[in-house]
């Protein structure tokens, strides 16, 4: 049986994959997903079942860096949706991002937290309105343990510099990027492509989409690609 393990990004949760899970399960795939537990859901780190068949990782944004190395290294194929090797690139763009991340970190656990999260999620949704995204439970508050995980992952976001540990060198890779992404800067998008082997990498640039490339059209694209990665 073919398997999928999916990973959401910073300030997300596994419910973002609900339509994706339904689609892949209807096609006979086994589905599991990372849950970091920022909000009310319990954390969960998935693992591959001992089954024959294809092992496909689908990761949105920071999700590529949140997967256990043992999961990533056993993948036959990887789909990166608005992902990156280094979120903060060298140079002026990186300096500006570093300042922004420190500002976000300073808001966590304060009265400024809801506004910071709402601004971040609005940038994720852009060029669409925030209402185009599923309701995010973080806007209703967090437990201290979930906030700490969010803080830890913000540090990871600032310091990741390369493809994550356990990267499967022989895997086929699909990179989907939104040309209007307001979260991942163009330099970081380019660096990801430079870090991947061209002969095994399929790059799709979506001119009308932003950071939240977990749309029905992208789901259709990924399902087609997974049939012949």
Where are these regions (language model features)?
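Conserved HGGG/HGGXW glycine-rich cap/lid loop of the alpha/beta-hydrolase fold
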Residues: 1-42
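Gly/Ala-rich beta-loop-alpha elbow adjacent to hydrolase catalytic centers
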Residues: 58-67
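Flexible "cap/lid" loop of the alpha/beta hydrolase fold
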Residues: 74-108, 149-153
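Conserved alpha/beta-hydrolase catalytic His-Asp/Glu region
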Residues: 111-158
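Short beta-strand/loop motif that positions the catalytic acidic residue
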Residues: 169, 175-177, 181
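Short alpha-helix in the alpha/beta-hydrolase fold that links the catalytic acid
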Residues: 171, 185-194, 218
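Acidic catalytic loop of the alpha/beta-hydrolase fold
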Residues: 179-184, 211-212
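Catalytic histidine-centered segment of alpha/beta-hydrolase-like enzymes
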Residues: 205-220
């Amino acid at each position: 049986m073919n398997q999928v393990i999916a990973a959401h990004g910073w300030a997300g949760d596994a419910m973002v994959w609900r339509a994706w899970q339904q689609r892949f399960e209807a096609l006979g795939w086994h589905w599991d997903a990372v849950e970091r537990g920022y909000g009310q859901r319990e954390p969960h780190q998935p693992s591959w079942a001992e089954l024959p068949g294809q092992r496909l990782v689908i990761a949105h944004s920071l999700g590529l860096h949140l997967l256990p190395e043992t999961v990533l290294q056993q993948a036959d194929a990887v789909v990166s949706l608005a992902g990156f090797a280094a979120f903060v690139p060298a140079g002026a763009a990186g300096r500006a991002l570093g300042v922004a991340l420190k500002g976000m970190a300073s808001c966590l656990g304060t009265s400024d937290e809801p506004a910071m999260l709402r601004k971040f999620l609005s940038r994720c949704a852009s060029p669409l309105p925030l209402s185009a995204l599923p309701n995010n439970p973080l806007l209703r508050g967090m437990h201290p343990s979930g906030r700490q995980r969010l803080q830890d992952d913000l540090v990871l976001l600032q310091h990741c510099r390369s493809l994550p540990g356990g990267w499967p060198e022989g895997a086929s890779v699909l990179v989907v990027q939104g040309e209007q992404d307001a979260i991942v800067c163009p330099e970081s998008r380019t660096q990801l492509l430079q870090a991947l082997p061209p002969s095994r990498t399929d790059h799709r640039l979506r001119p009308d989409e932003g950071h939240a490339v977990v749309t029905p059209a992208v789901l259709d694209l990924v399902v087609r690609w997974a049939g012949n990665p």
